[in-house]
Amino acid sequence: MKLELEKIMIEDIQFADQTKISDSTLFIDQKELFELLAEDNRITDINLDIVHPGDSVRIIPVKDVIEPRLKVEGPGGVFPGFISGEEVVGTGRTKVLKGAAVVTTGKIVGFQEGIIDMAGPGAEYSPYSKFHNLVVDCDVKEDIKQHEHEEILRMVGLKTASYLAEAAADTAADEIETYEQKPFLEAAAEYPDLPKVAYIYMLQSQGLMHDTYVYGVDAKKIIPTLMSATEVMDGAIISGNCVSACDKNTTYVHQNNPVIEELYKYHGKKYNFMGVIITNENVTLADKERSSNLTAKLAEMLSLDAAVVSEEGFGNPDADLIMNSRKLAAKGVKTVLITDEYAGRDGASQSLADADPSADAVVTAGNANEVIKLPPMEKVIGYQNFADLIAGGFEGSIQEDGSISVEIQAITGATNELGFNNLTSRSY
């Protein structure tokens, strides 16, 4: 499966009377987009805002971040199972609006959603502060329940990103990157002297709006499955998830998974990258045992020498992470685990809820319990009063001057467990 990503660099976004791309600027017909989104009669109000890096703007609570992509050649379309049909994606050509993103927000009671500050110290913790963002803020009818509310906002984000991407249809690429996932027998034979490595991609699936979708299917309902890395780039996996903001994988992160990109970087040089095994993080012990057993079985069938395993979320999924580590090790597969830590504000507590001697190579994305003070912004998009309620916030988080004291857990992407964040680790 061979996929070309044609990247079009976006250096500005503006509202205009026609949606188009010209001179690295994305122009958006606000009225046309509004009419598209308003087709869902469950939505009562829509507000569109454009924000740029360095703007004194706070977005809260953030639901999802999505990169506009358009499939121009090959089977299927971007976001299969939602925007396009169920055809297998991951081959052909896909255009990417690099530097632009869609951010969704809205008043959803009880959600563990987070903050994006476009300026100040908070901006340094969120990778999304570096994008030119179209923020879509939607209200829905009062009788809409939480699960349906999440579904409405999820579709609003995907529809908006797909609408914007259509502007790239006739725009020449500034940069082209090619990725290929060969059939397994062919891939194994290509570099017989290099260790065979795969990526174990854990997807949040705890339920209660902690969900991820694969080709439109709730990941709670899947068993571990082999995928081409190129399918992921075409939007086969999307976020429907309201887990803590710091380490949730937004749809943007799935589209731009840095673990996959890094594995391709040294493919054929240091190792033979054999592909992706997706698995879930269900809450029952039986589901955890089943998924980790089948993950280890697939690794054994591929004759893997090693695997990179990434977690999404914390607490309950720590058990899935360690089960995967232990069972892969029992099959002779070496592992490197990627996670983040909840080690207390002083960093002295146990970092994970589970542990095992097999987990002897671990990459940390940071301690989510660290506290930061975010200064007031000139403009707030959304509802700042949610700062006391979101994960990482606490009673008294909001100060009279508009500043917010929170754990970095509340900042979208601060400790992302795919490494899509700005933190680093140092030894002293």
Residue ranges of each PLM-predicted region?
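Glycine-rich, charge-decorated loop segments at or immediately adjacent to ligand/cofactor-binding or catalytic sites
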Residues: 342-360
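Extended, charge-rich low-complexity interaction segments
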Residues: 362-395
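A general structural motif
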Residues: 282-296
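A short helix->loop->beta-strand "cap" motif at the edges of active sites that frequently abuts
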Residues: 330-336
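Proline-aspartate-enriched helix->loop->beta-strand connector
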Residues: 303-304, 308
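Gly/Ser/Thr-rich loops at beta-strand to alpha-helix junctions
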Residues: 204-205, 310-319, 341-344
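Long, compositionally biased, glycine/small-hydrophobic-enriched stretches that function as flexible linkers
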Residues: 1-223, 395-428
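Membrane-embedded hairpin module used as a gating/binding unit in multi-pass transport
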Residues: 188-280
